[in-house]
Amino acid sequence: MIKTRGLITKVQPYKDNHLMINIYSQDYGKKSLIVFGGKSKKKRSSMIVGSINNFEFSTKDNVCKLSEVQLSHNWFLYNKHQLKLIDYACYMIDRLLFIEDNNSLVIDAYEELVNNLNDKKDYMISFFILELNILKSSGYEPNLSYSIISKILPIEKYKDQDLTVLFNLLDQNKEF
């Protein structure tokens, strides 16, 4: 049995009382797993899209055993736009990421986004950082150098990999 920590990106019904879930972990990438009894009426399921859990699964038959649930979010406090943001982030992760990447910061950026949502802080910058990490982990290297950005936004010169200028512009909500 393999143990990993992952993000649930998709939940679908499978046969009678079972669920098929897609998870993304840094160690094993995207996995589709079957959870027997996941829709049972006797036992409440903790398989919620967007939750980060510890999973235990077999590589032979992709049967999952949920070993520890860490609900690090307060869904009932979110408005519909914040819920849509979580759903969109999980959809992008599910569609774009499929291989393992130990250097990926997607899970960390997602946790930062959820923490900002929970603490009622400004979450748009963490969402943009999450999107950039998803693009980077999927193989696209967004070119955010000064020569490209200066054609779009009237900004002062900055180091090519230092994106704090861009995030400060977003933070100040300047419109151009």
Residue ranges and their predicted role:
Residues 1-19, 24-176:
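Non-catalytic alpha-helical scaffolds and adjoining flexible linkers that form interface surfaces
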